[in-house]
């Protein structure tokens, strides 16, 4: 963030996923999470947020898709969920050939429970059941993908990403087919990987 060689005023930033029904200033909002850690710390040209409170969610998906088309993504920084999701592309809704760039998805129970386990929500009942997400093809349009995956609870998903079948059953497995894709692990998340 503090690298003086980067002219942040030339960069349009996007976030990849957002809960439906969560206020943008709520601590659980991914837009809020990114804003306080990154977006407020450097002078981006523009920061674009998904609106999980939009009255018409299909229009919101189209608005965001139009922005992504107007400002093609160069770099995606992402993680992997316990179920192998990238953004909110859980196994049941992931589609490697999705015709959409942004869509409404139903979150699977493993994804929702992860949010409780990580103390984002106190109980499963408080975790939204739906979210907005960039689709897998939208993510793969980026020139570069940097996937950062810490913590032991992600070790199985990392194993499936690296060694399992490339399929929507582990959405992150598609990263193996993406040129210019890098996976960064800590010792705990990498415990099942032969290095």
Report the location of each language-model feature.
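A glycine- and small-aliphatic-rich helix-loop capping segment at beta-alpha/alpha-beta transitions
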Residues: 1-7, 30-35, 91-101, 166
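Solvent-exposed alpha-helices and their adjacent loops that cap or buttress functional pockets
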Residues: 5-7, 41, 67-71, 95, ...
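Class I SAM-dependent methyltransferase SAM-binding "motif I" and its flanking Rossmann-like core
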Residues: 87-134
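A short secondary-structure junction signal
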Residues: 59-62, 87-92, 97-98, 157-161
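ATP/nucleoside-binding phosphotransfer catalytic cores, i.e., glycine-rich phosphate-binding loops
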Residues: 134-137, 141-195
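Short, flexible loop segments at the rims of nucleotide/cofactor-binding pockets, characterized by
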Residues: 53-56, 122-128, 161-162
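Ligand-binding beta-strand-loop-alpha-helix segment within the catalytic cores
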Residues: 6-77
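Glycine-rich phosphate-binding loop
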Residues: 71-96
């Amino acid at each position: 963030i503090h690298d003086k060689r980067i002219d942040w005023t030339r960069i349009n930033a996007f976030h990849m996923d957002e809960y439906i029904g969560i206020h943008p200033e709520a601590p659980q909002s991914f837009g809020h999470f990114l804003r306080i850690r990154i977006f407020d710390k450097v002078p981006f040209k523009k920061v674009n947020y998904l609106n999980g409170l939009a009255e018409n969610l299909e229009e919101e998906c189209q608005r965001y898709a139009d922005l992504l088309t107007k400002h093609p993504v160069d770099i995606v920084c992402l993680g992997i969920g316990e179920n192998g999701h990238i953004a909110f592309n859980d196994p049941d809704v992931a589609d490697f050939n999705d015709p959409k760039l942004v869509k409404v998805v139903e979150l699977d129970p493993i994804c929702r429970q992860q949010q409780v386990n990580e103390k984002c929500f106190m109980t499963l009942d408080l975790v939204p059941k739906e979210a907005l997400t960039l689709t897998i093809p939208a993510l793969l349009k980026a020139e570069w993908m940097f996937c950062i995956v810490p913590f032991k609870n992600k070790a199985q998903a990392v194993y499936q990403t690296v060694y399992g079948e490339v399929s929507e059953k582990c959405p992150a497995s598609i990263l193996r087919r993406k040129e210019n894709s890098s996976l960064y692990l800590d010792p705990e998340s990498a415990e099942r990987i032969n290095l």
